[in-house]
């Protein structure tokens, strides 16, 4: 069996909104009824029925503009895939927090932070523009 490949040097049919008139017709090899319809097309178009006009259109074009502009449901697959990976990542992070990471160091405790801040104020750290400049040492409270 010999497989015949398509000749890509010839124009190919493609439905595109930005290029509405393709160089070749959609149907390349016409059947006997389609050939008869093409002969009938050469006469007056008023003698053609609506079904015949649609059939002639379908010989030339695969889709109408309304069919090309119709939305697809591909976005649902993309959103579903993204949500799957986000959920999987959340599960991995929860597993890591439970089994891999240890408890937080004591320096993250609110009491520790308060003691450290008080120590920095007592040492008058950065008295010009920093933390100590915003503390009122006479009233023992933050400046307003």
Curated annotation (Swiss-Prot):
Membrane topology: Single-pass membrane protein
Recorded metabolic or biological pathway in which this protein acts: Energy metabolism; oxidative phosphorylation
Ranges facing Mitochondrial intermembrane side: 100-144
InterPro entries xrefs: Cyt_c_oxidase_su4, Cyt_c_oxidase_su4_fam, Cyt_c_oxidase_su4_sf
Compartments it resides in: Mitochondrion inner membrane
Residues recorded with modification N6-acetyllysine: 4, 28, 35, 42
Subunit note: Component of the cytochrome c oxidase (complex IV, CIV), a multisubunit enzyme composed of 14 subunits. The complex is composed of a catalytic core of 3 subunits MT-CO1, MT-CO2 and MT-CO3, encoded in the mitochondrial DNA, and 11 supernumerary subunits COX4I, COX5A, COX5B, COX6A, COX6B, COX6C, COX7A, COX7B, COX7C, COX8 and NDUFA4, which are encoded in the nuclear genome.
The protein, known as: Cytochrome c oxidase subunit 4 isoform 1, mitochondrial
Organism encoding this protein: Gorilla gorilla gorilla (Western lowland gorilla)
Gene transcribed to yield this protein: COX4I1
